[in-house]
Amino acid sequence: MPRFPAPGSRVSVRYLAEGAHTDVIGHLLAVGPRIEVRTKSAGTVSIPSDDVVAIRELSHTAVRASEIRNLEHAAALAWPGTEQHWHRGWLLRAGGGHTSRANSAVPLDFSSAIADLEPIVEWYRERELDPWLAVPDRLLAVRSAGVKHTRVMVRDLDRTPVTVTAVLRDRPDAAWRTGYRREVPDEVLTAVVDGEVVFATVVGVAGARGAVTVAPDGTAWLGISAVHVAEGHYRAGHGRAVCEALQIWGADRGARRAYVQVLEDNDAAIALYAALGFGLHHHLRYIDARSLLRTSL
């Protein structure tokens, strides 16, 4: 049985009805032995949960492919690794293997194509790295399921006054690394292309990274990442505190919107971002480019 999104989500459901696959799109009202989906044209559809073949959460408003491409461009500049190379519309990033974002190629131009993968594979081979592709929905027609399924969530930014309890620094110090469970070098964490980066810390308790970069359409985006809370300090509002501090910092630097990238199975992080006003924009997944060279698309 598939994993169901929370009630209230807008979803696309494929299910079995009289031995054939049927699709429905609408808002998920209830989850249980039966799920209920409110549609625009057919009212509320009740479906036995066991008959659901696949269910996918959708953004609440229509998102154009160009909007996805613009956001992904800003996000790639915000996590560029320590080395970058453009190849026929693909931005290749390398950062010593630390983090998927800093060590993957992302298609950022209309010209990006699967036919161009062999040079990408070779570029990563020369650096002794696996040739991962970060593939956002709708930018490339690829059938591979991939791994690390990720949702990209967004919200508009404003300068709503809040009490800031986090300290902001331009580098990740020992206090920031408290509770950060990854050994990512400073040169990878601080890397940004044509933008600014900052690190928010509630000393000894929590931290997060923020970066402001600009998309090709001129939109300045704040990317929030590496949000972490030290063990023993969960559910006390510290994650919210560092995120709110970063949102104010980003707004002060001209960012109009903010985004986060979060793994689909990280329910706690998704709940935090939803509480902060973030909603689904699109999905992405990681695919080993070598697997696409060996199979037909």
Language model features with spans:
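SH3/SH3-like beta-barrel fold
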Residues: 13, 34-40, 47
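Conserved beta-strand-loop-alpha-helix junction that forms the acyl-donor binding cleft
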Residues: 133-139, 231, 260-270, 286-293
